[in-house]
Amino acid sequence: MYKQGEPNLWTGRLDSETDPKKFRHFQTVTFEDLSKLEKSSTPSGVGILGYAVDKGVALNKGRIGAKEGPDAIKQAFAGLPDLNQCETLVDYGNVYHDHEELIDTQKEFATLAAKSIVNHRQTFLLGGGHDIAYAQYLATRKVYPTQSIGVINIDAHFDTRAEQQSTSGTSFRQILEEDENTGYLVLGIAQGGNTQSLFDYAKEKKIDYVFADELLSHVSPTIKDMIERFIHEHDVIMFTICMDVIDSAFAPGVSAPAVLGLYPHTVLELAKRIIPSDKVSSVSIAEMNPTYDADNRTAKLVANLVHHFLK
């Protein structure tokens, strides 16, 4: 079920009503009905769409609450300064789960997300469970029907479980099994968060991955080269971040809190190797769970990541 954006989420400190250099995002955001959006001749600005769904998390036996993530992130983002002076910033609202099967919600989200990708230079998709990634893939493939898609996931988990239905832990297996014209790179894998069968599947499918232990102090030249090579090998890049990759000291409000997770600045450094590429079609950020957040710490962290990602 799709609902348009809520203007009352977008509030903040008012420094000026006339000087754009003093504006914050809540002063520049607009709201549109994405279901009625016509294709523009030239992509411009930024589109934001929320995936207010945690059904996939529940099916994956995780902590529910991530369906409240998109609105919490938007509220935190609203008060940040508009340093980039975005040509357009549109909140398209959220998609909610009201179908019998999760896959139907993912398809509904994909149809809408594809419209944002076509119309904007940057599209941010805010979760919600990491089943958002499969919906993001469907949207990407809709926009780019024949191109090779490189999926880059900053995550503690492979999320390549074999299940009978779509969950927050199956997205990337679904992608790889359904589409031979895709590749998968995972940055931040937790050795204690993945079974041997998942490592075996990664070997079988030639999944590139980097352990969290390799990213604790800095991003090495070898890893930078791996990222650049992966981007070069694909026509389109689908970029996604699962917030459970970040140590719970910094990101307590997630579906599965990380032990020995990454530092936020490491995630930011990794993302800055990816975001500048013109091949990036969209960015999703998943598993922000306000139920377990402390002082809005995780919501603010996601908001600031998006703020840094703006071109």
Swiss-Prot record:
Binds 2 manganese ions per subunit. It catalyses: N-formimidoyl-L-glutamate + H2O = formamide + L-glutamate. CDD domains: Formimidoylglutamase. It comes from the Bacteria. Pathway: Amino-acid degradation; L-histidine degradation into L-glutamate; L-glutamate from N-formimidoyl-L-glutamate (hydrolase route): step 1/1. This is Formimidoylglutamase. Pfam families: Arginase. Its EC number is 3.5.3.8. Keywords: Histidine metabolism, Hydrolase, Manganese, Metal-binding. It comes from Staphylococcus aureus (strain MRSA252). GO terms for molecular function: agmatinase activity; formimidoylglutamase activity; manganese ion binding. Mn(2+) 2 binds at residues 155, 157, 242, 244. One of its GO terms (biological process) is L-histidine catabolic process to glutamate and formamide. Its cofactor is Mn(2+). Catalyzes the conversion of N-formimidoyl-L-glutamate to L-glutamate and formamide. The gene is hutG. PANTHER family: ARGINASE/AGMATINASE, FORMIMIDOYLGLUTAMASE. Belongs to the arginase family. Mn(2+) 1 binds at residues 130, 155, 159, 242.
